[in-house]
């Protein structure tokens, strides 16, 4: 592959810069094998989350938006239409909250969407201060969208039926 997106971000101050010619549709990502996608604002938050929850991390897909734009999410889902569950792990601030609502509305109704809100401003802050967080309560989970449940019709098979001898009331 060839580079399509690059950016610089500061962790101490509000420094954000995208490289010249960077395409927001191609965010920092890991493509896993299962049908779950975890979405973050910045690569540092994505990596911090994996550090906090390393178990089977390779199975899941992870995507950094490079902010709160939905371009990278739409591009990722166009490449991976088999994704069934999206976890929006955006920052715990107004911009993150507003983006979660907007992004959830963009996703098809067949996709389950859950907001995973960090207990601090972002996932890097949670990682840095994890020793101070009681009982590893690093986040709260909020379901934003669930696909409609399909109504199934029960099928009775002959093999499941019970054979009962019947006595005729009259003979034909």
What do the PLM-derived regions correspond to, one by one?
Residues 1-79:
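Phosphate-handling DNA/RNA-contact segment within nucleic-acid enzymes
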Residues 51-172:
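TOPRIM fold recognition
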């Amino acid at each position: 592959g060839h580079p399509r997106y690059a950016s610089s971000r500061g962790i101490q101050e509000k420094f954000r810069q995208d490289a010249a010619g960077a395409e927001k549709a191609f965010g920092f990502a890991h493509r896993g094998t299962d049908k779950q996608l975890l979405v973050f604002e910045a690569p540092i938050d994505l990596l911090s989350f994996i550090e906090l929850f390393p178990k089977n991390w390779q199975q899941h897909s992870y995507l950094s938006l490079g902010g709160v734009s939905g371009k990278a999410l739409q591009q990722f889902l166009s490449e991976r239409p088999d994704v069934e569950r999206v976890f929006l792990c955006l920052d715990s601030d107004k911009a993150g909250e507003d983006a979660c609502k907007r992004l959830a509305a963009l996703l098809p109704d067949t996709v389950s969407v859950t907001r995973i809100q960090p207990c601090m401003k972002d996932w890097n802050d949670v990682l840095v201060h994890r020793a101070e967080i009681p009982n590893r309560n690093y986040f709260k989970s909020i379901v934003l969208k669930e696909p409609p449940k399909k109504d199934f019709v029960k099928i009775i098979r002959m093999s499941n039926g019970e054979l009962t001898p019947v006595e005729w009331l009259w003979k034909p």
